[in-house]
């Protein structure tokens, strides 16, 4: 058989059919292969090996099918072929900051859910109603359902959680007085509504004056020599802080119908500066006949001088297991220390001389020379009357307040005698928790005095506002603010005086943005409410109320209490004192 060549085999194949599967004719357009498509489809790659991994952000089978399945189907590609490829990828570029940052403690600020249980108490006042408290003057006070902490935390919305928040102490404070079962809550008003009240500040008039004053020692105004500061001395002097209803002069003025409302400057200043307060406090209100007395309990928190109450990082109470060093800087310990400093600083900064003292119209009404063994402290009591009447009032509404001044000084220009209010700020430890970012007084007081004073105005807003209010009520000519620091930051036993700064009371109030009109509006509103509650009562009936600042929220609550409330406690305390005296004598 003759051999067959490959060319012959190829030539023998049928010419009408090609090798392979049959070619359909429905995808040909004028002899050119054509694939149907929609202009709305995105053009993609046949196979994209540079796309993100399927394991990233996988959230279950449904998310996987939705995000990754059939990504490379024709017309469904997510990567555009026409993206401009950047030469250098800057998505991972970051700036490295080598500066050291300070960590701010944020526990306890604005936690809206922490005190939710307390928020359920109250009625219309909490929801923004106008149940009793009204604005004095034009306009109506509108309350809201959001309570903002005056230190900056947002009390209703809370804050973002941070690292180890579970291990940080909660800023839960105890009330100044426990609410008893037989008390009835009448009103609840938040500070945002109190801040809207306003009454034109009245000009007071002097009714009478008691006591005497020593001259202020001007040497304290000079900058002390380094390492030669004056130590604060504990002086034994007879000083009195009698409440309103126990003041014999106020009782005489009430019998003469000289006014309708009676108070002392320390009680009235707390009420007028209430929107700045953070800690809990309480005021007892006694309504007898047509007279209203703003009173205080024995050993009330109003008598204590707080420290860094308005600081963002305020001092905290510690547990029983804490060390001695931590217990020195608790709010209660610092308040006792500051009260001791203020009492002794006012006594130390005067020149005690019987020949040069300035006497008032009457002697000290609380001093009994036959019973007291200690010499009398320099103190002047001025009883002043303020007119809080409005044009629509049928009868005038006057308030008598007992004010205090601490020293006297001659004006270097005119030679006139100026009455002074002497107070002291105290530093415990600028590096300890609760210091509020205060500067070191020993090194910065005289070189950066403005910064030191500004920090104190921020951290002790309520304290300085009360002092300025008391000085304005007393019509004092100037204020002396002393700066007293611990001799050893780890001990509260010894203190040194670093310097004294002078202010005019109204200038200090202006620097702190203190609105006295708002304070008078608060007082007038509470007086109106008390009178309205007892409008249908018998004239001789004695009714008693307690006004309490909530310890954890910017809210005031008014309670109706039995007439003998706190009197039993005073009698029990007197009996304990008598027993202790008898045991000591035996």
Swiss-Prot record:
Residues 301-315 are annotated as: RNA gate. It comes from the Eukaryota. GO terms for molecular function: mRNA cap binding; translation initiation factor activity. Residues 566-577 have a biased composition (Acidic residues). Residues 162-174 have a biased composition (Basic and acidic residues). Residues 16-37, 104-176, 563-586 are annotated as: Disordered. GO terms for biological process: cap-dependent translational initiation; formation of cytoplasmic translation initiation complex. One of its GO terms (cellular component) is eukaryotic 48S preinitiation complex. Pfam families: eIF-3_zeta. InterPro entries: eIF3d. PANTHER family: EUKARYOTIC TRANSLATION INITIATION FACTOR 3 SUBUNIT 7 (PTHR12399), EUKARYOTIC TRANSLATION INITIATION FACTOR 3 SUBUNIT D (PTHR12399:SF0). mRNA cap-binding component of the eukaryotic translation initiation factor 3 (eIF-3) complex, which is involved in protein synthesis of a specialized repertoire of mRNAs and, together with other initiation factors, stimulates binding of mRNA and methionyl-tRNAi to the 40S ribosome. The eIF-3 complex specifically targets and initiates translation of a subset of mRNAs involved in cell proliferation. In the eIF-3 complex, eif3d specifically recognizes and binds the 7-methylguanosine cap of a subset of mRNAs. Belongs to the eIF-3 subunit D family. The RNA gate region regulates mRNA cap recognition to prevent promiscuous mRNA-binding before assembly of eif3d into the full eukaryotic translation initiation factor 3 (eIF-3) complex. Component of the eukaryotic translation initiation factor 3 (eIF-3) complex. This is Eukaryotic translation initiation factor 3 subunit D. It comes from Aspergillus clavatus (strain ATCC 1007 / CBS 513.65 / DSM 816 / NCTC 3887 / NRRL 1 / QM 1276 / 107).
């Amino acid at each position: 058989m003759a051999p067959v060549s490959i060319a012959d085999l190829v030539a023998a194949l049928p010419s009408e059919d090609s090798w392979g599967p049959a070619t359909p004719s429905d995808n040909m357009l004028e002899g050119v292969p054509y694939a149907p498509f929609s202009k709305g489809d995105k053009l993609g790659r046949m196979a994209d090996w540079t796309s993100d991994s399927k394991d990233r952000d996988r959230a279950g089978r449904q998310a996987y099918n939705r995000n990754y399945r059939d990504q490379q189907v024709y017309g469904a590609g997510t990567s555009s072929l026409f993206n401009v490829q950047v030469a250098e990828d800057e998505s991972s570029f970051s700036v490295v900051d080598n500066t050291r940052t300070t960590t701010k403690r944020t526990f306890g600020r604005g936690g809206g859910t922490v005190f939710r249980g307390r928020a359920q108490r109250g009625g219309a006042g909490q929801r923004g109603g106008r149940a009793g408290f009204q604005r004095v003057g034009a306009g109506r006070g509108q309350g809201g359902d959001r309570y903002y902490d005056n230190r900056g935390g947002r009390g209703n919305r809370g804050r973002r959680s941070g690292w180890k928040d579970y291990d940080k102490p909660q800023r839960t404070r105890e009330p100044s007085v426990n609410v008893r079962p037989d008390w009835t809550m009448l009103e609840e008003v938040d500070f945002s509504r109190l801040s809207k009240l306003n009454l034109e500040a009245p000009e007071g008039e002097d009714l009478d004056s008691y006591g005497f004053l020593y001259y202020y020692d001007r040497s304290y105004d000079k900058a002390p020599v380094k390492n030669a500061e004056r130590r604060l001395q504990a002086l034994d002097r007879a000083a009195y802080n009698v409440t309103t209803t126990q003041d014999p002069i106020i009782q005489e003025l009430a019998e003469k119908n000289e006014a309708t409302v009676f108070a002392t400057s320390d009680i009235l200043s707390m009420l007028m500066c209430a929107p700045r307060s953070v800690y809990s406090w309480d005021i007892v209100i006694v309504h007898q006949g047509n007279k209203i007395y703003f009173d205080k309990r024995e050993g009330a928190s109003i008598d204590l001088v707080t420290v860094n109450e308005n600081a963002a990082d305020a001092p905290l109470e510690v547990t029983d297991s804490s060390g001695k060093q931590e217990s020195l800087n608790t709010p209660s310990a610092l308040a006792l220390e500051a009260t001791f400093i203020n009492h002794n600083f006012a006594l130390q900064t005067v020149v005690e001389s019987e020949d040069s003292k300035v006497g008032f119209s009457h002697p000290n009404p609380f001093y009994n020379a036959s019973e007291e063994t200690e010499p009398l402290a320099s103190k002047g009591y001025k009883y002043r009357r303020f007119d809080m009447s409005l044009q629509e009032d049928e009868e005038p509404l006057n308030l008598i307040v007992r004010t205090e001044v601490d020293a006297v000084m001659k004006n270097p220009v005119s030679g006139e005698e100026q009455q002074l209010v002497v107070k002291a700020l105290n530093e415990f430890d600028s590096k300890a928790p609760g210091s509020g970012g205060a500067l070191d007084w020993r090194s910065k007081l005289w070189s950066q005095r403005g910064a030191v004073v500004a920090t104190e105005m921020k951290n002790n807003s309520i304290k300085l506002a009360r002092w300025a209010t008391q000085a304005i009520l007393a019509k004092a000519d100037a204020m002396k603010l002393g700066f007293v620091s611990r001799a050893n930051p780890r001990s509260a036993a010894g203190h040194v005086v670093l310097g004294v700064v002078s202010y005019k009371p109204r200038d200090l109030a202006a620097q702190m943005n203190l609105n006295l009109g708002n304070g008078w509006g608060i007082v007038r509103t509470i007086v109106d409410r008390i009178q309205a509650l007892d409008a249908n009562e018998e004239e001789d009936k004695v009714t008693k109320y307690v006004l309490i600042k909530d310890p954890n929220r910017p809210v005031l609550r008014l309670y109706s209490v039995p007439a003998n409330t706190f009197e039993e406690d005073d009698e029990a305390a007197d009996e304990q004192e008598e027993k202790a005296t008898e045991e000591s004598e035996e």
